[in-house]
């Protein structure tokens, strides 16, 4: 029960939170129930607990192992296109669950894991696929950036820090961490800097690949709970990485040229055949990817051998980018409409405006990542003016606005502002 007291000569009753015991003067808000009170801080704490519970899993089947179709159905809600890559990831995660379930049964056959390499041009959804995957599975999941890794003993992060992040995601439960999934982003940035091995020490390239070999294949890693270099005297945790699934992703800029050059016999002199530049899209070229191309790019054979499943992603065309703008649950257009809704203003886009935005992103060759910067530039002036304008009911964006030849149309509650149509 909440406490009520008469302090000194004050005739007013002081109310207290029934959960934490703080008085009404110590908190911003005290909410009254039939016989109890709760403060705003306790409400926030309860919401955090509920959010953590909801994060545990979004997909589960009757047997506790989500089917590939169930995983892909959730990925489809957030990620547009990339059907092949989503199928590969869905099957890999499903098999990961099955392998963990199989471990508890006595069997002569040991199921080995199949680590995955995602290859695709920038802005096609590699990292976003991994982030979405993290939300829908109920095993510990962590993402690591390969560009920050260095060989042991040099300034930078050790590869053991990846396992430390997985441990943190599992709340330092070693058993759960040993069943987790790790996504290593920007793995193309640790390619060998020279075709000739070991001329000089390559601590952020080949050295990192070699350091990753054992933890990707399976070893007992000694992980410092607080980071190894700042606290050398701490006790190490032993984590077996045999059952941790590793997914690596990278843009591999220039790999398409290596693939195109493979198999083409070049000749010189007057009888040489003139070959046109490969005009196919990068995603189409990546479909012909072979492990030998990755070796020429700078990955060492042992590293490629530990990534048996290779999934290639396509570069996004105009139609796919328009879908990305409008269809996913957290689509960019929906995000900006929510921002404008906070100002009690409706934001709408003409179809030609969406296609013009998508065309600009294709020209910049930045994929879906470039859509936000284009939208920000288009809506910047409007977002600057809107809070000080009164009576605006709707803002309409046309194709001319995207091209820069017109200003957004402001529709007021009682009249239309013709000024919005005047050419800039």
Curated annotation (Swiss-Prot):
GO MF terms held by the record: ATP binding; ATP hydrolysis activity; ATP-dependent protein folding chaperone; protein dimerization activity; unfolded protein binding; zinc ion binding
SUPFAM superfamilies: Glucocorticoid receptor-like (DNA-binding domain) (SSF57716), P-loop containing nucleoside triphosphate hydrolases (SSF52540)
Keywords noted in UniProt: ATP-binding, Chaperone, Metal-binding, Nucleotide-binding, Zinc
Record has ATP-binding as a keyword: yes
Pfam family, one: AAA_2
Organism superkingdom: Bacteria
Record-linked SMART domains: AAA, ClpB_D2-small, zf-C4_ClpX
GO cellular component: HslUV protease complex
ClpX-type ZB domain ranges (all copies): 5-58
GO biological process: cell division; proteolysis involved in protein catabolic process
InterPro entries on file: AAA+_ATPase, ATP-dep_Clp_protease_ClpX, ATPase_AAA_core, Clp_ATPase_C, Clp_protease_ATP-bd_su_ClpX, ClpX_bact, P-loop_NTPase, Znf_CppX_C4
Assembly with partners or alone: Component of the ClpX-ClpP complex. Forms a hexameric ring that, in the presence of ATP, binds to fourteen ClpP subunits assembled into a disk-like structure with a central cavity, resembling the structure of eukaryotic proteasomes.
HAMAP family in the cross-refs: ClpX
Functional description taken from the UniProt entry: ATP-dependent specificity component of the Clp protease. It directs the protease to specific substrates. Can perform chaperone functions in the absence of ClpP.
Family: Belongs to the ClpX chaperone family.
Protein name: ATP-dependent Clp protease ATP-binding subunit ClpX
Gene that encodes the chain: clpX
């Amino acid at each position: 029960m909440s406490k009520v007291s008469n302090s000194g000569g004050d005739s007013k009753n002081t109310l207290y939170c029934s959960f934490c015991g703080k008085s009404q003067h110590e908190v911003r808000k005290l909410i009254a129930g039939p016989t109890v009170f709760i403060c705003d801080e306790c409400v926030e704490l309860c919401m955090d607990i509920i959010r953590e519970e909801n994060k545990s899993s979004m997909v589960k089947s009757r047997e506790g192992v989500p089917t590939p179709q169930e995983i892909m159905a959730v990925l489809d809600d957030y990620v547009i296109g990339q059907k092949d890559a989503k199928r590969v990831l869905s099957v890999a995660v499903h098999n990961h669950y099955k392998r963990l379930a199989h471990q508890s049964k006595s069997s002569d056959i040991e199921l080995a894991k199949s680590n995955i390499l995602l290859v695709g041009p920038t802005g096609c959804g590699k990292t976003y696929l991994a982030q979405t995957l993290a939300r829908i599975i109920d095993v510990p999941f962590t993402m690591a950036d390969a560009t920050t890794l260095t060989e042991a003993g040099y300034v930078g992060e050790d590869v053991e820090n990846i396992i430390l992040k997985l441990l943190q995601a599992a709340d330092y439960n070693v058993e759960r961490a040993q069943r987790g999934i790790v996504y290593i982003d920007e793995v193309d940035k640790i390619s060998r800097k020279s075709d000739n091995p070991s001329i000089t020490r390559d601590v952020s390239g080949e050295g990192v690949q070699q350091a990753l070999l054992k933890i990707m294949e399976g070893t007992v890693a000694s992980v410092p709970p607080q980071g190894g270099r700042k606290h050398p005297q701490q006790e190490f945790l032993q984590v077996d990485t045999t059952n941790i699934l590793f997914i690596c992703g990278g843009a591999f800029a220039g790999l398409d040229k290596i693939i195109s050059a493979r198999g083409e016999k070049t000749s010189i002199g007057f009888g040489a055949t003139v070959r046109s530049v490969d005009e196919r899209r990068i995603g189409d070229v990546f479909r012909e990817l072979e492990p030998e191309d990755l070796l020429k790019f700078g990955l060492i054979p042992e590293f490629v051998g530990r990534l048996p499943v290779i999934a290639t992603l396509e570069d996004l065309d105009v139609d796919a980018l328009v879908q990305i703008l409008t269809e996913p649950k957290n689509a960019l257009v929906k995000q900006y409409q929510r921002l404008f809704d906070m100002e009690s203003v409706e934001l709408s886009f003409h179809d030609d405006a969406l296609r013009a935005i998508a065309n600009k992103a294709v020209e910049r060759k930045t994929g879906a990542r470039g859509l936000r910067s284009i939208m920000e530039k288009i809506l910047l002036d409007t977002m600057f003016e809107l809070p000080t304008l009164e009576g605006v009911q709707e803002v309409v964006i046309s194709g001319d606005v995207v091209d820069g030849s017109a200003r957004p149309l402001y529709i007021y509650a009682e009249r239309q502002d013709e000024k919005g149509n005047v050419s800039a």
